[in-house]
A protein has these predicted regions:
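ATP-binding N-lobe of GHMP and related small-molecule kinases
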Residues: 1-104, 122-126, 130, 167, ...
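Short beta-strand segments
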Residues: 10, 95-97, 147, 155, ...
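Conserved, helical-rich catalytic subdomain that frames metal- and/or nucleotide-binding sites
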Residues: 54, 153-288, 303-331
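DPxDG-like acidic metal-binding loop motif
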Residues: 104-134, 145-149
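Glycine-rich beta-strand-to-loop/alpha-helix junction loops that act as flexible
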Residues: 108-109, 292-296
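Short, well-structured alpha-helical segments that form the helix of a local strand-helix-strand
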Residues: 128-139, 281, 309-312
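Short hydrophobic/aromatic beta-strand micro-patches
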Residues: 299-301
């Protein structure tokens, strides 16, 4: 083991520049085609060795069995020592300073779990990269991305990752309290049910949320129970309104305005509350705005160094919370 007893790491949240839900597997997991990008909005995670057992602080209200940081420590210790506690297994203390909104669509819990895995690997070692990746995937679909960070084109359930170009220099604003917080599982279920809406209603809603493609649902594949069939989504191509390929092309141009114009997220179809926030942002200087993951947080993309005072004032006056404003220069 390393001689260090404590490590403190940043745990960056993520945004999805494009998010298309492409299907549902027989095991219930949904497949996606998405472009993920880490942000400057981070939790701070400190992991220390000593004592016995595993303790996690800073995640009040989250049960131990649902706490991804706790489960990450358990998974790592079992892989390294064969047991999460007992003789020969060090005690682990995890302290989390939360900044990423809980259930906000920015993978805050996944980011914390990934930070715990990286910290333990730094403190203890002896677990190979492949095993670390397997532990990450066992915790949740976003944890593998949070483990590596950067910018990735992700498919499968999010675990098949291909590096892509990062955003050029930009200013990011993240707005919270943009709707009712619902679990990711609930949002996927609502998107499943979206295919039952008639085409006229769907087209109207797509126009309201500013989708970049025709979002009319397709009845093909819907069973007698009204549930979308396994492996069938959208019009057979797996697309509702989002277009990861278009985003990848836009990123390759390194033109922020074009990138903002290519942003899209299928979950906006079942998150109508995000529309008002998006309009506030784009009406006050943002080149584009989009729902964060499954929501309900929303981000706005601005030119690097842009004056965002008007946008902040408009957002706060409407009763929303500005969670983060930050510049990301070139790497």
């Amino acid at each position: 083991m390393n001689c260090k007893e404590s490590v403190t790491l940043r745990a960056p949240g993520k945004i999805n520049l494009s998010l298309s839900v492409t299907g549902r597997r027989a095991d219930g997991y949904h497949t996606v085609d998405t472009v993920m990008h880490e942000t400057g909005l981070c939790d701070v995670v400190t992991v220390s060795l000593g004592g016995r057992g595993i303790s996690v602080s800073g995640t009040d209200g989250i049960a131990r069995e649902s706490n991804l940081a706790y489960r990450a420590a358990v998974g790592y210790l079992r892989a390294r020592f064969g047991a999460a506690e007992g003789d020969g297994t060090p005690g682990v203390t995890v302290e989390i300073e939360k900044h990423i909104p809980v259930s906000g669509g920015m993978a805050g819990g996944s980011a914390d779990a990934a930070a715990v895995l990286r910290a333990l690997d730094s403190l203890i070692g002896g677990v190979g990269g492949e095993t670390l990746g397997s532990i990450a995937l066992s915790l949740g679909a976003d944890v593998p991305f949070c483990l590596v960070g950067g910018a990735m084109h992700c498919t499968g359930i999010g675990e098949v990752m291909t590096p892509c170009r990062r955003l050029p220099p930009h200013r990011l604003m993240v707005v919270g309290d943009c709707g009712v917080k619902r679990s990711t599982a609930r949002m996927y279920a609502e998107l499943d049910g979206y295919a039952q809406v008639d085409a006229a209603d769907s087209e109207r809603h797509a126009e309201e949320v500013g989708s970049v493609r025709d979002a009319a649902p397709y009845a093909e594949g819907i069973g007698a129970d009204g549930v979308l069939g396994v492996g069938t989504y959208g019009n057979g191509t797996g697309a509702f309104c989002s277009d990861a390929h278009g985003m990848l092309q836009a990123l390759d141009t390194a033109e922020l305005r074009r990138i903002a114009g290519a942003m899209s997220n299928d979950f906006e179809l079942v998150n109508p509350a995000c529309t008002d926030v998006k309009r506030l942002l784009t009406g006050n200087g943002a080149l584009g705005a989009l729902l964060c993951g499954s929501g309900p947080s929303v981000f706005g993309l601005f030119e690097y160094g842009a004056d965002v005072d008007a946008a902040e004032e408009a957002v706060r006056a409407a009763g929303y919370t500005v969670l983060y404003v930050g510049d990301s220069p070139a790497d």
